Amino acid sequence: MKKINRNKPVPWTVLSLALAATILMLGLQPRTSLAEDLVVYKSPTCGCCKKWVKHMRDNGFNVVVHEQYNVTPKKDEYGVPRRLRSCHTAKIGGYVVEGHVPADVVKQLLEEKPAIAGLAVPGMPMGSPGMEGFRKDPYDVISFTSTGKTGIHASR
């Protein structure tokens, strides 16, 4: 009968502990990307749109960009009310995201799943993601339904 040396750990025990520690650490790490793509339609010449895309990527979104000079047909297709339109249009999780909507508001939208068509930040307010500069203007994130009903979803 072979004698076990208590001073030398059994390889399977060490391997099991290492595997358990790895699984635990992976489970505790924050998500770095969301499962579904954020599909963005924007003009290839728009600098603030590029900055908004970077903001979304920096906040864990996997962004797929479609560059086209005329984004209006996508806005029409997705039912974005004319008074809420901005420079770029995106879609994720069945929702429309119009303009410079902050990443945390989009994450909240995807978690809460309200009965709306999407969110919009009309125009291009200074201080919104992608429009950072020397000043920060207050702005609202507007929710809208497929029938055109709107409401203030968040204020910044």
Predicted region positions:
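Bacterial N-terminal signal peptides
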Residues: S16-M25
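Thiol/selenol-based redox catalytic cores and closely related redox-interacting motifs
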Residues: E77, R83-R156
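Conserved helix-turn-beta segment immediately C-terminal to the redox Cys motif
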Residues: V53-P73
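Short active-site oxyanion
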Residues: D37-L38, F61-V63, G93-V96
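Stable alpha-helical elements in mature extracytoplasmic
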Residues: T45, W52, E67-N70, P102-V106
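Local sequence-structure signature of Cys/Sec-based thiol-disulfide redox active-site neighborhoods
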Residues: L34-V53, R57-N59
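N-terminal secretory signal peptides that target proteins for export/translocation
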Residues: M1-K8
